[in-house]
Amino acid sequence: MSEINSIANGTYTIGQTSATNFVAGHGIKIDEPSAGTVRIANDETVLYDSSALISMDKALGTTFNISEPVTNFEKFKVYYTRFPWTDQCPTHQIQEFDATVPVNVIVLHTSFATSTATNTSWYYCAETITDVSGTTWKLNSCSQMQLPNGNIDSSHIYLKPYKVIGINRISGGNE
């Protein structure tokens, strides 16, 4: 017979009633979604999820809201895609950031290649997001650089975040 004991808010032990209990380690979430069912998973919280990507051609100055500050977590992941889409670029990408480092700006980036009959070019794109210590994030600037000639075209490409996930809650929110 197994049992689950709550030994503190958000901390559980699992084990046999007469055997050694095993404690869920930091970053592991154990819950009981229904009677007699135990779910063990990573401690992740969805802070923003939009299947409708920001539809503007130009994202500069656009804001979006997350449900709570990422500083309530050890890390956070941003899922994003390039807009407009092309066959040469990865469609969806993920970057993970350390939320314990006090920053207010993050940079999403991607690189991709295009090819024509006479030329193959590598592109690098970077998008800055400001105010990430709060709950209203702003898409601030985006630039594209064509390598190797270094031409910059800031009106051509945008990176669109569509999901933000907090990992391993450390404080605040709905613990």
Where in the sequence are the language-model features?
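Glycine-rich, low-complexity segments
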Residues: 1-23, 37-61, 165-175
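Extracellular disulfide-bonded cysteine-rich modules/repeats
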Residues: 24-32
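Ser/Thr- and Asn-enriched, surface-exposed coil loops between beta-strands
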Residues: 36, 60-62, 103, 131-138
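Surface-exposed ligand/attachment interfaces on beta-rich extracellular proteins
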Residues: 52-73, 83-103
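Hydrophobic/aromatic beta-strand segments within beta-rich folds
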Residues: 76-78
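Extended low-complexity, serine/threonine- and proline-enriched intrinsically disordered segments
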Residues: 80-84, 94-96, 160-167
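An exposed tryptophan-centered "aromatic clamp" motif
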Residues: 91-128
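Extracellular jelly-roll beta-sandwich "head" domains, especially the C-terminal globular C1q domain
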Residues: 114-175
